[in-house]
């Protein structure tokens, strides 16, 4: 199969592929620049490299260049400590890391993209021509692939079952797992998203989630497969993002719930040109859903994993209006089921589809990952009679107290409705009598007593679900994609 970028350069070459508000690259430009860089990357003779990158046009060119050079990319979370980075890269035998940001990491060959660009003056990232190759851009409507392009040097085709990217699970408990994502996985995910969410060549998708996470990288894959425009943004700033939404004909945006809250607080009270606001990474509160729908914001809740190459469950605004706690229904190209449901219908969520990884690269000795072709997500979920899926908690986060199963999410949802509490999380606390009891951490600017909280929670929860311990904190620990790091509270 021809590389998607190569096909877009042929068929959709004059369409804007990527813009950062200052520079814009058509698919023709992007393919030519990526091809030129790929030629240089081949000299490093690596089949797998680490990428330490930001949300920039340079980073996107680097990603495509690696793929054109048949190099697997292992994405590095830039917020990790040096030891965490070392452990991840060593676990999958990465020796060289390409960077668009400064990085010092002993024991690895670190190559800054700027050093590649200007090493021999035969490649730049600003459209300058190769000194040794007659690269010319054809601006006619008939031929959009650059004349004498490096396609005669680089292989323009690929195998769908080749590994495209490697990402590590967030690793909130236990060792981090290396997830290999093939081109087939990415393609199936993109097709599923198109069917359940909707996008086309006229889409203008604002992407501010980190590229090194699947939520960010998946937008780039959808774009190059479909041929739409990505408006790349490096850092989230509510005022700046709102200005872009108002002025740049943004049709799609991916956010975590907290960033949508900030945008609504900033003044996002109408959709403007927005057709789809894709939410994920954390649970939505009923209050936030109600507020967003009152503003006629086209919010779509979703659920996905690194192992499934992003979302495979999607809830439309209509679904959220009917049932705010749902993450929707599966894409048509995946199958989901509940393993060993209890009397309430709650059990472990299982998924099967071409978007699902084939198995972890590291550790290699994990058991129970797949059962009869279904991937075990590790999430406690329910599928109701209408086919709506509700995710309750990670199985590992379940609190078992005196033989009773307690879902932290249920307690957290009630606690967040207490006046003055802006955020809350419940974890299991060791107890000599019951094994575990719930402990609630909460964020508030008000003075709230334990007695007040117990009195309020008792109106909504069974007695055994009432937390036995309470702790007020300034903030709760979240990852860069908005996922709560419960392990830091377990240790705390």
From Swiss-Prot:
It comes from the Bacteria. It catalyses: 2-succinylbenzoate + ATP + CoA = 2-succinylbenzoyl-CoA + AMP + diphosphate. Signal peptide: none annotated. It comes from Staphylococcus aureus (strain bovine RF122 / ET3-1). The gene is menE. HAMAP family: MenE. The keyword Transmembrane does not apply. PANTHER family: LONG-CHAIN-FATTY-ACID--COA LIGASE, NONRIBOSOMAL PEPTIDE SYNTHASE PES1 (EUROFUNG)-RELATED. It is an enzyme of class 6 (ligase). Keywords: ATP-binding, Ligase, Menaquinone biosynthesis, Nucleotide-binding. It holds the Pfam family AMP-binding. Converts 2-succinylbenzoate (OSB) to 2-succinylbenzoyl-CoA (OSB-CoA). GO terms for molecular function: ATP binding; o-succinylbenzoate-CoA ligase activity. Pathway: Quinol/quinone metabolism; 1,4-dihydroxy-2-naphthoate biosynthesis; 1,4-dihydroxy-2-naphthoate from chorismate: step 5/7; Quinol/quinone metabolism; menaquinone biosynthesis. InterPro entries: AMP-bd_C, AMP-bd_C_sf, AMP-dep_synth/lig_dom, ANL_N_sf, ATP-dep_AMP-bd_enzyme, MenE. This is 2-succinylbenzoate--CoA ligase. GO terms for biological process: menaquinone biosynthetic process. Its EC number is 6.2.1.26. Belongs to the ATP-dependent AMP-binding enzyme family. MenE subfamily.
């Amino acid at each position: 199969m021809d590389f998607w970028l190569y096909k877009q350069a042929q068929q959709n070459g004059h369409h804007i592929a990527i813009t950062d508000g200052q520079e814009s690259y058509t698919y023709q430009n992007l393919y030519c620049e990526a091809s030129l860089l790929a030629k240089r990357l081949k000299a490093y003779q690596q089949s797998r490299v680490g990428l330490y990158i930001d949300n920039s046009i340079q980073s996107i060119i680097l990603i495509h260049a690696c793929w054109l050079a048949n190099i697997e990319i292992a994405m590095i979370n830039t917020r990790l400590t040096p030891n965490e980075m070392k452990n991840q890269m060593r676990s999958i035998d990465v020796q060289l890391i390409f960077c668009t940001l400064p990085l010092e990491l002993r024991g690895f060959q670190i190559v800054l993209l700027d050093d590649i660009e200007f090493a021999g003056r035969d490649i730049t990232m600003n459209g300058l021509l190769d000194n040794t190759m007659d690269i010319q851009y054809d601006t006619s409507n008939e031929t959009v692939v650059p004349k004498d392009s490096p396609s005669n040097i680089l292989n323009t085709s690929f195998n769908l079952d080749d590994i495209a990217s490697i990402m590590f699970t967030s690793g909130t408990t236990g060792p981090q797992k290396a997830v290999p994502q093939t081109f087939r996985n990415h393609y199936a995910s993109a097709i599923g998203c198109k069917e359940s969410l909707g996008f086309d060549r006229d889409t203008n998708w604002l992407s501010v989630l980190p590229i090194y996470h699947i939520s960010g990288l998946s937008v780039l894959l959808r774009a190059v497969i479909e041929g739409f425009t990505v408006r790349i943004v490096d850092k989230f700033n509510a005022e700046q993002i709102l200005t872009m939404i108002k002025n740049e004909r943004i049709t799609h945006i991916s956010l975590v719930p907290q960033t949508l809250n900030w945008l609504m607080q900033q003044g996002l009270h109408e959709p403007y040109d927005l057709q789809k606001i894709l939410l994920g990474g954390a649970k939505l509160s009923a209050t936030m859903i109600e507020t967003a729908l009152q503003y006629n914001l086209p919010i779509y809740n979703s659920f996905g994993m690194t192992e499934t190459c992003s979302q495979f469950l999607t809830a439309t605004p209509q679904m959220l209006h009917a049932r705010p706690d749902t993450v929707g229904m599966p894409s048509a190209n995946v199958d989901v089921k509940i393993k060993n449901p209890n009397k309430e219908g709650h059990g472990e969520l299982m998924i099967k589809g071409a978007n699902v990884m084939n198995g972890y690269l590291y550790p290699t000795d994990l058991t129970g990952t797949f059962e009869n072709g279904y991937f075990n997500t590790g999430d406690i979920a329910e599928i109701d009679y209408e086919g709506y899926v509700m995710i309750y908690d990670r199985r590992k986060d379940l609190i078992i107290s005196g033989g009773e199963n307690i879902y932290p999410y249920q307690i957290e949802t009630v606690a967040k409705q207490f006046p003055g509490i802006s955020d809350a999380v419940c974890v299991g606390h060791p107890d000599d009598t019951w094994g575990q009891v719930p402990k609630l951490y909460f964020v508030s600017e008000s003075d709230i007593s334990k007695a007040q909280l117990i009195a309020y929670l008792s109106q909504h929860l069974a007695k055994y679900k009432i937390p036995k311990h309470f702790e007020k904190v300034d903030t709760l620990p979240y990852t860069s994609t908005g996922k709560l790091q419960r392990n830091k509270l377990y240790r705390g």
